[in-house]
Amino acid sequence: MAVQQNKKSPSKRGMHRAHDFLTDPPLAVEPTTGEVHLRHHISPSGVYRGKKVVKAKGE
């Protein structure tokens, strides 16, 4: 099992964790309906890239 030789200081620990944060998901606006959805996913109304691909639950 690997064991560290020297304790990592709080500064170095923070530098190591500098890129461990979560980023906001990329959102897109459907041009035909104006709805916001995740990129490369269908909108809540079932539209993807301007075409109706699935029926919505209320339809």
From Swiss-Prot:
Source organism, top-level taxon: Bacteria
NCBIfam families xrefs: rpmF_bact
Name the record gives this protein: Large ribosomal subunit protein bL32
GO molecular function: structural constituent of ribosome
Higher taxonomy: Bacteria, Pseudomonadati, Pseudomonadota, Betaproteobacteria, Rhodocyclales
Gene that this polypeptide is encoded by: rpmF
Swiss-Prot/TrEMBL keywords: Ribonucleoprotein, Ribosomal protein
A Gene Ontology BP annotation from the UniProt entry: translation
UniProt organism field: Aromatoleum aromaticum (strain DSM 19018 / LMG 30748 / EbN1)
Membership in a protein family: Belongs to the bacterial ribosomal protein bL32 family.
Assigned GO CC terms: large ribosomal subunit
Annotated segments matching region Disordered: 1-28
Pfam family, one: Ribosomal_L32p
